[in-house]
Curated annotation (Swiss-Prot):
Belongs to the universal ribosomal protein uL29 family. GO terms for molecular function: structural constituent of ribosome. InterPro entries: Ribosomal_protein_uL29, Ribosomal_uL29, Ribosomal_uL29_CS, Ribosomal_uL29_sf. GO terms for cellular component: cytosolic large ribosomal subunit. Keywords: Ribonucleoprotein, Ribosomal protein. The keyword Ribonucleoprotein applies. It comes from the Bacteria. This is Large ribosomal subunit protein uL29.
Length: 66
């Protein structure tokens, strides 16, 4: 999800998506540990998506407009 798409969401929607992505990340790490992970780059994608969403929420709290 692109940053501009994230900025169009409400804070509550972003927090819901972050929670879902954290669950997915947990499952991906579990699959990695058991050797069942087919696409290891998905872990990086999910981590970066979480970071983007948290950045947008933090920008809103501080009051930075982009």
């Amino acid at each position: 999800m692109k940053t501009n798409d994230i900025r169009e969401l409400t804070t509550a929607e972003i927090e819901t998506k972050v929670k879902a992505l954290k669950e997915e990340l947990f499952n991906l790490r579990f699959q990695l540990a058991t050797g069942q992970l087919e696409n290891p780059t998905r872990i990086r994608e999910v981590r970066k998506a979480i970071a983007r969403m948290k950045t947008v929420v933090c920008e809103r709290e501080i009051g930075i407009n982009r």
